[in-house]
């Protein structure tokens, strides 16, 4: 495939790594999203990026945005993705009344969360972490199908600390083990993000809206309790563990979330949230385990 096959239409935005355009495949008439990654002229394309991206082309699943092709020219890399017209952040923002956040109806929350976990379970089975899950990366079709976008890009290009784009690197969905400098993270970092996203779909507002690493941890410990060697063996040896963290007890999640929700919250969804938001990464559910949670029984029993 060459870039001449595509007609570049309007710019959709600047991401962390790339400028994104809507494009048209001239031969098929199908819309695509073109992500253009500028390459450093001296360094050329990092071979790891090419490797990671070719892995992504193999990820074919209903809940993962398809990467159709990669066009490699001298000074840029163009990733050709399927075009999606909405994302979870925009979708939730469009429902805000005045300035008041509004969560989604619980049956929709469940349907979106199920699809998020389905896509994630598939990636994790293929040994690929997302590393940067957030509502902006969850794309939605008009029929309510949810797909994970930007898969593997964090690994291919590194998560920049200061981005040149309008998109702040968001800490809100980042796991406490990563915030404390753990280098041995695994699929459990994505599970933490899933928990944050689930709570946000329920209430319409981010669960832990921190502005820096320190505040982010404080917000997490305020709600989930402060970890110690009993609840999380090894936590005190993490590089950014601070022995002066204020000791907090876990709050009642149901009581915290219920005021934002019209319908009474099901104990099952609170139980699932606890399973996703375990401070100790070894205690978090896997995506596969989460899909078998009783809250989803209507999906797997039918």
From Swiss-Prot:
PROSITE patterns named among the record's database cross-references: PROTEIN_KINASE_ATP, PROTEIN_KINASE_DOM, PROTEIN_KINASE_ST
InterPro entries (alphabetical): CDK, Kinase-like_dom_sf, Prot_kinase_dom, Protein_kinase_ATP_BS, Ser/Thr_kinase_AS
E.C. code: 2.7.11.22
Record: residues binding ATP: 12-20, 35
Function: When phosphate concentrations are high it phosphorylates the PHO4 transcription factor thus establishing repression.
Quaternary structure and partners: Interacts with a number of cyclins.
Protein name from the UniProt record: Negative regulator of the PHO system
Organism this protein belongs to: Candida glabrata (strain ATCC 2001 / BCRC 20586 / JCM 3761 / NBRC 0622 / NRRL Y-65 / CBS 138) (Yeast)
High-level lineage: Eukaryota, Fungi, Dikarya, Ascomycota, Saccharomycotina
